[in-house]
Design a protein with these regions (language model features):
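Long extracytoplasmic/lumenal interhelical loops at the membrane interface
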Residues: 271-331, 353-354
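Transmembrane alpha-helices of multi-pass inner-membrane enzymes
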Residues: 366-376, 381-411
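A juxtamembrane structural motif centered on a specific transmembrane helix
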Residues: 1-9, 47-50, 55, 356-361, ...
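Hydrophobic transmembrane alpha-helices and their immediate junctions
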Residues: 61, 200, 233, 331-374, ...
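A membrane-periplasm/extracellular boundary helix in multi-pass inner-membrane enzymes
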Residues: 133-135, 235-273, 291
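Aromatic-anchored transmembrane helix interface
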Residues: 62-71, 83-128, 132
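Alpha-helical transmembrane segments of multi-pass inner-membrane proteins
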Residues: 118-145, 171-216, 221-233
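N-terminal signal-anchor transmembrane segment
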Residues: 1-52, 72-80, 373-377, 389
Length: 411
């Protein structure tokens, strides 16, 4: 590995670690954007020096075509007066660019999947540790609710979704950011990595559950339960019968302590007036966006367009909870099929290429991750930007890793 390749790998590792930040920003410095730009430039140079440009172009016909059409749509939208079209296009394509480049870098052995998945684990542990520390400090009443909000704004430049919740007599704080999906989607694969001791894998499972509880998102809780159910099926027969019986007895006996508070939390998150209020916002957005789609159903209103008298964010006004519908508003039905369908096809084709060669539990985990990525934008902003796209990058890297290290994981 030459000096340029070594530098590239250092940038890749730092870039992955930067995903520990809620939005890749710290104290006003866009650390993640800087590292991603370096990654794209250095990765591009390394691939060109491989002298396999024609092979890459032939292999990436779909990606190149989709990129060209997106650039054309962006230019047309900007000419028609949509000043946000450039930002929208950047957010729409940035994760795809990193995804495709990392695919080729690993394929041509310019990047090492083993070290990449280690960096992903360290990054997720940092995210979990940060959430747990904030939770402990809040429970111990060393910090006020408003101070948590202020901390995220000043340190990370983002408005975290916060609320208080009760677990029995404990008053907890829920802190949710756009990148929380990364941990819930990718950590389950580490429960299956036999290079880690059973105690470590059990700890990672517990940390995943704690993290999901702190984030307190309905979607993430259901997703975690899907992964946990599959993991139990996978490991059930491997656990000695006596241990299984003792474990079940302990769970049932301890349910006297935890069952009622947990049920109360679930009722609050899924069926309370708080949940109803959140759903009402989506209903309003749906009505407004559907009316907008009817005005221009085929070609839409242009990249970066939005309903002028109804926005949820001043910095990205084209972003809505009902994200797929907002894409139809901007791109039209034709554009939605071409652009959103094209991006999903890129992700799915490359990930499935490697997933189909792995053991069944990795295949199922991959399908769960892909499924939730496809479903989530129907009711949450979960498609645009670096944070949302990283789960696809992670799924690709992890499946490539399992392919390379199949021996210990085969039946």
């Amino acid at each position: 590995m030459n000096k340029l390749s070594k530098l590239l790998n250092v940038v890749i590792y730092l870039c992955i670690i930067s995903y520990a930040l809620p939005t890749g920003v710290m104290m006003g410095i866009p650390i993640q954007k800087i590292l991603v730009c370096l990654l794209i430039i250095l990765g591009g140079i390394c691939l060109v020096l491989q002298r396999k440009s024609l092979e890459i172009i032939k292999s990436a016909k779909l990606e190149i075509t989709l990129g060209f059409l997106g650039l054309l749509a962006c230019i047309v939208s900007y000419i028609l007066g949509n000043e946000w079209s450039i930002k929208f296009t950047g957010l729409f394509y940035i994760s795809v660019i990193v995804f495709v480049e990392l695919y080729f870098l690993v394929r041509y052995e310019l990047a090492e999947p083993e070290k990449i998945i280690e960096c992903i684990l360290y990054m997720m542990l940092l995210k979990i540790l940060g959430k747990i520390i904030i939770e402990i400090v809040f429970v111990c009443k060393l910090i006020e609710y408003e101070a948590v909000i202020e901390f995220y704004l000043n340190m990370f430049g983002t408005e975290a979704s916060t609320m208080t919740m009760h677990l029995g007599r404990l008053l907890l704080i829920r802190v949710q950011t756009s990148s929380d999906i990364i941990v819930v989607t990718l950590m389950p694969f580490y429960w299956m990595m036999e290079k880690y001791k059973k105690s470590i894998r059990s700890l990672l499972f517990a940390l995943s559950g704690i993290y999901t509880l702190i984030v307190f998102s309905r979607v993430l809780m259901v997703e975690f339960c899907c992964f946990a159910f599959v993991a139990v099926l996978y490991y059930w027969k491997k656990i000695p019968k006596k241990v299984r019986c003792i474990g079940l007895i302990l769970v049932l006996a301890s349910s006297v302590l935890w069952l009622k508070p947990v049920i109360q939390m679930i009722e609050f998150r899924f069926f309370s007036s708080f949940a109803a209020e959140s759903d009402d916002v989506r209903q309003i957005q749906m009505r407004e966006l559907i009316n907008g789609v009817k005005e221009s159903p085929v070609f839409g209103h242009g990249f970066g367009s939005y309903i002028s008298d109804y926005t949820r964010s001043g910095s990205i006004p084209f972003s809505y909870e009902i994200e797929y519908l907002s894409f139809c508003y901007q791109m039209g039905i034709l554009g939605f099929v071409v652009f959103v369908g094209g991006v999903l096809l890129i992700y799915i084709r490359k990930i499935v290429k490697y997933a189909r060669k792995n053991i069944w539990v990795i295949k199922v985990f991959t399908l769960i991750g892909l499924g939730w990525f496809v479903i989530r934008p129907a009711f949450n902003p979960a498609f645009l930007g670096l944070q949302n796209g990283f789960q696809m990058i992670g799924l690709l890297m992890i499946n490539m890793y399992f392919n390379k290290k199949q021996e210990p994981y085969q039946k």
